[in-house]
A protein has these predicted regions:
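Short gly/ser/thr-rich secondary-structure transition/capping motifs
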Residues: 28-35, 65-68
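Residues that form or flank phosphate/diphosphate-binding pockets in enzymes
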Residues: 14, 43, 102
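Extreme N-terminal starter segment of soluble prokaryotic enzymes
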Residues: 1-4
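Amphipathic alpha-helical repeat scaffolds
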Residues: 7-15, 55
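Short helix-loop-beta junction
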Residues: 19-30
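Short acidic low-complexity segments
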Residues: 32-44
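Cysteine-nucleophile active-site neighborhood
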Residues: 47, 53-133
Length: 135
C-alpha cells in the first residue's frame, strides 16, 4: 500500500512523512510513504495526503504550479473516492474559497468558505487571543 504526501512547496513535509513512518513502524503495517509531486506516483497511490503550511493563496498557487495536479486530485479523490487527508491548509483548500490576504478559489470539494476567526466573545475583544489558534 502506498501513501503519497504531495510536495507542492508546503513547509511541513518532513514532519508529516516522519509521523506516518513512525505510526507505520509502531503498528507493524505494510505501507510505503512517498513525498512527491509526480502525477503518475500520485495516481498509482492508495492514499493521498495534502499537507499545508503558509497562506491559503500561496498554497493554492503551489498546487497550480504543478500542471495537471488539481485535475488529478479531483479525479482520484472525488470521482474515484481515493482516501484523502488534508492537513492544515491542505484541509482548508477543499472549501470553495479562502479569504486569507485575498479571496482565493479553493478546490470546491466542500461547500463553504475559509474565513479568519474573529477573536470576539459577546462583542468584547478577547485579549491575547492568538491566531492561528490550536485547540
Amino acid at each position: 500500500m502506498k501513501i503519497v504526501i504531495i510536495d507542492y512547496g508546503s513547509g511541513n513535509l518532513k514532519s508529516v512523512e516522519n509521523a506516518f513512518k513512525l505510526s507505520i513502524n509502531d503498528n507493524n503495517l505494510k505501507f510505503n510513504v512517498f513525498v512527491t509531486d509526480n502525477l503518475n506516483i500520485i495516481k498509482n497511490s492508495d492514499f493521498i495526503v495534502l499537507p499545508g503550511v503558509g497562506s491559503y493563496p500561496d498554497c493554492k498557487t503551489g498546487l497550480l504550479k504543478i500542471e495537471g495536479l488539481i485535475e488529478l486530485l479531483k479525479d482520484q479523490v472525488i470521482n474515484k473516492f481515493k482516501p484523502f487527508l488534508g492537513i492544515c491548509i491542505g484541509m482548508q483548500l477543499m472549501a470553495e474559497y479562502g479569504f486569507e490576504k485575498k479571496k482565493t478559489k479553493g478546490l470546491g470539494w466542500i461547500k463553504g468558505n475559509i474565513e479568519k476567526i474573529n477573536p470576539l466573545s459577546n462583542n468584547k475583544l478577547i485579549k491575547n487571543f492568538k491566531i492561528p489558534h490550536m485547540g
